[in-house]
Each structure stands twice: as C-alpha cells, then as structure tokens.
Amino acid sequence: MATTADFKSGMCLNLEGRYYYIVEFLHVKPGKGPAFVRTKLKSVTTGRVIEKTFNAGVKIDEVRIERRLYLFLYQDDMIYHFMQNETFEQVFVERNNIVGVDFLKEGDMVEIVVHADSETILFAEIPIHAVLTVIYTEPGIKGDTATNATKLATIETGASIRVPLFINKGDKIKVDTRNGSYVERVK
C-alpha cells in the first residue's frame, strides 16, 4: 500500500480493479480546507486518460511493474512477437496493447511492461523517436511555401505522416511515435 505522498510519474496503481499509471500529479494545499492531490491517470488497457483527485494521505494499491527490453521479431495478423535478448524467451502482444504500433519495424527494441507478481504483460511501448525511411511522397514544388507547408508521406511501416516539402522518397526521418509527427531529417 502506498499513500499520496509516494506518488511519482510512471507509478502504476490499482483503482477499482483496473490498472492506471500516473502521467501527472500535483499536491495542492489550499488556504482553507484539507490538502489533496490532483492526478492525470492513463489506463493501461485502453490508453484513456482520466483526471482523479485524492485526499492527502489516502492509501492506494500500488502495482509493482517491471520494464523489460525485447526485440521485435515479426507480426502475425494482430499478434506481434518479441524476443528477450539474454534468455531468448519469446512473448507475444496484441496490437491494441502496443503504444505507437504504427511506427514499429522488425529489429526494433521495445519496452514491455510486465506485472511483477503475476508475470502478465500489461502493454508494450516503442521508443519515443523512431528513424524511418520515406517510401513514397509527392515531389515538393519550389516556391510553394507561403506558410509552413507540409505534404503527406508514406513511411516504411506503411503509416502516413505529414512532412515538410523538402523531404523526398528515400530520405530517413525521425518521427515522434507518441503523436506521429515529423521531428527532423536524419543524415
């Protein structure tokens, strides 16, 4: 059992039988009345973010989780197969339990979050930034840049993102996997 004084970002909680991890929290001590903690919690299963307020000092069930590095091997329909490099143990994760799945390619290292007591896989997260190759994009027209102009590009994983006009087919780009946005061109 943990109290609100133990809260930290990334901590996993069990609320009403569902697992959430803390995205953001703020201890508030108003001038009048008792202190409380305002939090933003992200559901492990659905990815939905909720806001919840706790009274200061309340005991909450903390869930012990472990983050383990796995190598992405291949995709079989909606199931993704991973292997741990040290033990060569293979596990699989369903597509809807992988954060940033549209930017995952074979050979990428992925963090899989596991419940420490029951060894069940909760979800998988790919790194925040991924370097991917553009396989198709329309050529940019010079002089067509009145504002911050972008165009649609298809990357090697099959996902489509918006990129600046100077990006061409075959260029390597860095993509933010949290929101699917272009970060920079990689040489």
Curated annotation (Swiss-Prot):
<dbReference type="GO" id="GO:0043043">
    <property type="term" value="P:peptide biosynthetic process"/>
</dbReference>
<comment type="pathway">
    <text>Protein biosynthesis; polypeptide chain elongation.</text>
</comment>
<keyword id="KW-0251">Elongation factor</keyword>
<dbReference type="Pfam" id="PF08207">
    <property type="entry name" value="EFP_N"/>
</dbReference>
<dbReference type="InterPro" id="IPR015365">
    <property type="entry name" value="Elong-fact-P_C"/>
</dbReference>
<dbReference type="InterPro" id="IPR012340">
    <property type="entry name" value="NA-bd_OB-fold"/>
</dbReference>
<dbReference type="InterPro" id="IPR013185">
    <property type="entry name" value="Transl_elong_KOW-like"/>
</dbReference>
<dbReference type="GO" id="GO:0005737">
    <property type="term" value="C:cytoplasm"/>
</dbReference>
<comment type="similarity">
    <text>Belongs to the elongation factor P family.</text>
</comment>
<keyword id="KW-0648">Protein biosynthesis</keyword>
<protein>
    <recommendedName>
        <fullName>Elongation factor P</fullName>
    </recommendedName>
</protein>
<dbReference type="InterPro" id="IPR011768">
    <property type="entry name" value="Transl_elongation_fac_P"/>
</dbReference>
<dbReference type="GO" id="GO:0003746">
    <property type="term" value="F:translation elongation factor activity"/>
</dbReference>
<dbReference type="InterPro" id="IPR013852">
    <property type="entry name" value="Transl_elong_P/YeiP_CS"/>
</dbReference>
<comment type="function">
    <text>Involved in peptide bond synthesis. Stimulates efficient translation and peptide-bond synthesis on native or reconstituted 70S ribosomes in vitro. Probably functions indirectly by altering the affinity of the ribosome for aminoacyl-tRNA, thus increasing their reactivity as acceptors for peptidyl transferase.</text>
</comment>
<dbReference type="Pfam" id="PF09285">
    <property type="entry name" value="Elong-fact-P_C"/>
</dbReference>
<dbReference type="InterPro" id="IPR001059">
    <property type="entry name" value="Transl_elong_P/YeiP_cen"/>
</dbReference>
<keyword id="KW-0963">Cytoplasm</keyword>
<dbReference type="InterPro" id="IPR008991">
    <property type="entry name" value="Translation_prot_SH3-like_sf"/>
</dbReference>
<dbReference type="InterPro" id="IPR020599">
    <property type="entry name" value="Transl_elong_fac_P/YeiP"/>
</dbReference>
<dbReference type="Pfam" id="PF01132">
    <property type="entry name" value="EFP"/>
</dbReference>
<dbReference type="InterPro" id="IPR014722">
    <property type="entry name" value="Rib_uL2_dom2"/>
</dbReference>
